[in-house]
Structure formats: C-alpha cells, structure tokens
Amino acid sequence: MNTRMVNPKKMVFLAVILLLPSFALAQPSNSNWLSQADRAKFDQLRISGSEALYNLDYEGARKIFKEMAIAFPNYPAGPQFLADTLLIEALYQTRRLQASLYNSDSFYNTSDDKPDPKLVDQFRTYTRTARQLVESRLKQYPNDAEALYFFGAIEGLKASFEETVERRHFAALKDGNDAVDKHRDVIKLDPNYRDAEMTIGLYDYTIGALPLAKKIAAGFLGHRGSKKRGIATIERVAREGNWVKEDSKTLLILLYTREKRFAEAATIARDLAAKYPRNYLYKLEMADALVAQAALERESNHVAAPSAAETEAFATFEGLVHDKNLPETTRKALDLIHFKYGEALRTAGLYDRAAKEFVASAQVVGAQEGLATMAHLYAAQALDLGGKRNDALTQYRAVLSRPNVYDAHEQAQTGLKEVYKRKMT
C-alpha cells in the first residue's frame, strides 16, 4: 500500500484509538491453534484481563496476561496483551488516554516530551515475541485467518505506540496501513470475520475524510474510501462483532464527535461509563460530547441559557472533581479532569471559570509535566478571552518557565506579543 498519498496527520490521528484499548482478540475460528479445553481456559483469562484493563486496573491486568503467556507459550495473545497493557498504562500516566486530546495540531509538533527507553524496549520485546509466534504459525498454516488477524492486530498496536508514545508519525502510518492490509486478507479468507472489519472501516473512513484533491490523488493509486461506509462498517462491528465490540464503540465516540454527531457520541460514552464505573475516561468523553452538543444547539437556536446537555456535562465534571469516594485511578487523574473541565467551560464561553480550572490542573500535586504546561497556556488564552490581559501575561510566562511540550513555547511567545483571539471553526 502506498503511504505517501494518505494524509499522515489525519491517518495517525485516527489510528491513535484504533486499538486503544486493544485487548480484543481474534474471534473464534476453525483454527486448531488451541484445543477446545485450552480455549475455554484462555477465554476466562481474556475476559478477566479485559475487565481489569477497561477499569484501568493495570497491575491486575498485567498479572492475568502474564499467567496467560505462561499457560499458552505458543499463542501470541499473552505477549500482545502485555504490550497493550504497557501502552495503555503509559498513556494513562502521561494523560493522553482520551481521544479528544489528539484533536489539535499542537500534538503533531515537536516537543521535549520523550518516552522512557525501558518502556520502549519492553514494548518491542512483547510485540516481537507475539509477531514471531504468528509468523511461525503462518509458516505451517498460511491461510489461518486467526493468525492473520493477530498479525494485523500487532501491527495496529505498534502503530498506536509509535504515534502516541514515540510520536513517530510516518512509522505509525506505515504500520497502520500494514494492519489494514492484513485484515483485508482475513476477510478474503473468511468474509464473515466481523472483527477484522473494524480496522478496514477505520481506513475507509480515513480515506473518505481526506480533502478532495488528496482523495482524488489517492483514488488514482487505488485507495478509495467513504466516511459513510466506514462508519457503517464500524457500527456493524459494534453490533455483531465478537471481541472488539467495545473497541468499536470507543472508536465510534471519536468518529461521531468528528462528524458533529455529539448526541450519539454522548450516548455511547454514557453506556460505557456505566458498564465500567472505574474508568473515568468514558465520563470525560461523555461530558466533552455533551458540551459540544450544547454549543451546537446554542449556535443554531441563538440561545445563551445553559442547555440540559451542558448542565449534565458540568455536573459530571463537578462529580469527578469533588466526589470523595472516587477510585484511586480517577483521583490520580485530577490534573486531566480539571483540564478537561476548563476546556468545557471555555467552549461555553465561561472564560474566568475556565482559567481557574486550567490553573487548578497545573497545581494538582503530581500533575503530569506536559499537561501542566498546556494548562498554563490554556489558562493564559482563557484569561485573554475574558479580558484579563495582565493575568494572561503571568500565565504565558509560566509556560516559558516550564519544559516545552508540543508547540506550547511558541504559542506562549506569541501570546506575550498579542492578545489571544479564539479561532473560528
């Protein structure tokens, strides 16, 4: 597949969530890779590990997946799931485990933010082990759909890591495209292999979302897509898939949001938040979608009063900020929660309150450094929008005193020279 004609920024932005969390597995097939008894035991471990990971219990998930790797040494799921856990925990620790954080050009600029070499080495060890097991299987059984599905899943996992942790955009694009090719091969072997369609649907959507000129150029090279068809495919997987239903629903939150189908995004996020109560991320995604829906309604109806959607969103944030009985994973993410609350308030035009939440984010004990830098920047911009120039200048200077992340220093230097004005989209 030629990678040059696919807009790398758009492709990897979507690939971020492709397998995140990606502890789905190849759906049951006619493969005899595992005996019936082994598969029953394996399924128990898979379900337990998946539940732990969706609820952000990384240590619990890691323990289960290590047990899986030992119990089934010739099956790639154990090392693949261990790699998944490493990726998701790393993103949690750096506060990137939320789709809306990628919806900014800032993410694609250079920064001082570098991954831990030990993390990179461990991740590559796990994915290399998983891939070797898959390749060994394919040498014996070249048309094994389950092995090919694993192959594509591993390539997609590598793409997510390269994009979100290493920020190697073109490497992510290449591996993401390889994942699509492998899953297309799966469908050729088994047209009813529904889980493989998630990757294909995402690719279909991505090509369909390209600007017209690039879409035409991609078409000449044989790359065709449709946003409508891509979303429909992922919706079908969410309904009929075997082990990637939750992944597909998570992906739909992002795609619905990009298509301004905010109410539908909020509905899915609300359902997943109820199913996985210890996972605060779905609550944040729900609140994001509700705020965007409220802004859309306000623009359409020319009504300034808060809508029901906005009220629900703010109540969600207030609950996350002030609930004394929050799970530890949520308490440890208060920097992100305050940050997202600030974004919601800024969208609603409540700039003073937004600035306070951004400052609160930066001041959380143990706040992630990169997020704290961006929080100071966003506080400055909110203060500018609220007409408090002197306070804004203080926050811009705070940005420059901190490690650079994305293009924060560049934006802060611009902010010191001129009042920030909100971009109209």
Residue ranges and their predicted role:
Residues 73-74, 142, 191, 242-243, ...:
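Short coil turns that delineate tetratricopeptide repeat
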Residues 47, 81, 88, 150, ...:
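"A position-specific structural signal for the A-helix of alpha-solenoid helical repeats
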Residues 54, 88, 157, 206, ...:
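Register position in tetratricopeptide repeats
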Residues 70, 181, 188, 238-239, ...:
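Amphipathic alpha-helical segments of tetratricopeptide repeats
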Residues 180, 184, 222-226, 231, ...:
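TPR/TPR-like (Sel1-like) alpha-helical repeat modules
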